[in-house]
Amino acid sequence: MAGHRKLGRPTDQRMAMLRNQVTSLLKSGKIETTVTRAKETRSLAEKMITLGKRGDLQARRQALSFVTEEEVVKRLFDDIAPKYAERNGGYTRMYKVGPRRGDGAEIVILELV
């Protein structure tokens, strides 16, 4: 699929990192990360919320195959997705925080709207 960022990692490590970030975002409501990671995480998180809005068994199984914690999938389908029933996309928001002290990478807060 064209347009995906490699984030300086092999595919398996990159997908594991993104799965963990999506799980953390859905669990806590917001995460702090770099801009490029946030853009990739945002795309995948919005797909998970759209699956939650579908609400059928197939959607739940697809979400379980991506999200790393079963309790988070339950929360996604029971609490998060119904909150966005009237919204068509745009479930997340990004705030710039500033550069990271160690390497100067631009940091953002990615949160659910």
Curated annotation (Swiss-Prot):
UniProt KW keywords: Ribonucleoprotein, Ribosomal protein
Xref: SUPFAM superfamilies: Prokaryotic ribosomal protein L17
Disulfide bond positions: none
Superkingdom field: Bacteria
Classification via HAMAP family: Ribosomal_bL17
Subunit structure, interactors included: Part of the 50S ribosomal subunit. Contacts protein L32.
Family statement drawn from the similarity comment of this UniProt entry: Belongs to the bacterial ribosomal protein bL17 family.
Name of the protein described by the UniProt record: Large ribosomal subunit protein bL17
Organism the protein comes from: Clostridium tetani (strain Massachusetts / E88)
Lineage of source species: Bacteria, Bacillati, Bacillota, Clostridia, Eubacteriales
